[in-house]
Amino acid sequence: MNYLPAPDRYAGKMPYNRCGKSGLLLPAISLGLWHNFGDTARFDTCQEMIRCAFDHGITHFDLANNYGPAPGAAEETFGRILQKNPQIRREELVISSKAGHEMWPGPYGNGGSRKMLITSLEQSLRRMQLDYVDIFYSHRYDPDTPLEETLQALVDIVRSGKALYAGISKYPAAEAGFAYNYLRERDVPCLVYQGRYSLFNREPEAEIIRQANQHGAGFIAFSPLAQGLLTNRYLNGIPEDSRIARPEGFLKAEQLSPEVLSKIKSLHEIATDRGQTLAEMALAWLLHNPLVTSVVIGASSADQLLNNLKAVHYPLFTDEELIAINRICL
């Protein structure tokens, strides 16, 4: 049966926010392909998630050269999905990729050198079967490469037409400030900063989010559920099929300390009183911040994606709820 995009996908299902001072609107929720789109994932499941996301107003798909497993596999999967679903029209999508983490062996497969960034983008475009990406990020600050070299590579990539906008991710505040000024002076203003931000990671509030706003850049939050801790999944221990239970996973059992578990249970009580799951409330709390342009979520199924999308129509937080949440998390 041929797939047809939902005709009402832009009829109020998803709010869109302006990204910094640019003309680009991004959905409040973006779909990240960090997990669950590698070569161990079922193609039909991946395709169903992309279709479901598009049908519900998600137009921004967040990738990187090393997303997998294996590195590059998520981009290949995404490219195959776009080829098999021409009804998901390229002009309706914002596709981002990144480079900076280890990608291939040898001295040129990691870091922020001009060679690494430009070569990586060429490979990403081939894997996704695209002529350009909308946003290309320097995925991390590389202290072993002159920052001017990394940033000039972004400038030249945008000027070449192989990316429409430049972004930075996980940069320290000092280096981010330098990047904003360098890029603006060369008429390629930084569109967006992407950083780890959640109820359990409030560090960006100290400077990063405000700094991005002051320089006219948007802010995109990733890992909004703290790698799954901010869900109902661990209320009664560690399930056998959870991320913590996997030895190769990023989340480790020691991160679920008695103190963290107590916080999870207290937040769960507030969410229940609001008529939400903990995950929905954690996402809604991020969307409550007017300086957050978009929140990147992951999903392992279309059903999980739909459950998390409920967060975009959240009930407003009361002052009492916000105080209680801060008391638990800070």
Residue ranges with predicted function:
Residues 125-145:
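Active-site groove signature of glycoside hydrolases
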Residues 2-13, 145-330:
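Beta/alpha (TIM)-barrel catalytic core signal, keyed to glycine-rich beta->alpha loops juxtaposed to Asp/Glu
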Residues 41-53, 112-128, 176-180:
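Short, acidic/polar
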Residues 20-38, 96-109, 132, 137:
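N-terminal small/glycine-rich loop or linker at the start of catalytic domains
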Residues 37-42, 66-73, 142-146, 173-174, ...:
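Acidic-and-aromatic substrate-binding clefts and catalytic sites of carbohydrate-active enzymes
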Residues 1-93:
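N-terminal binding-site loop/beta-alpha segment at the start of enzyme catalytic domains
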Residues 27-31, 61-63, 93-97, 136-138, ...:
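Hydrophobic faces of well-ordered beta-strands that scaffold small-molecule active sites
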Residues 41-45, 73, 77, 108-116, ...:
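Alpha-helix N-cap and loop-to-helix initiation/capping positions
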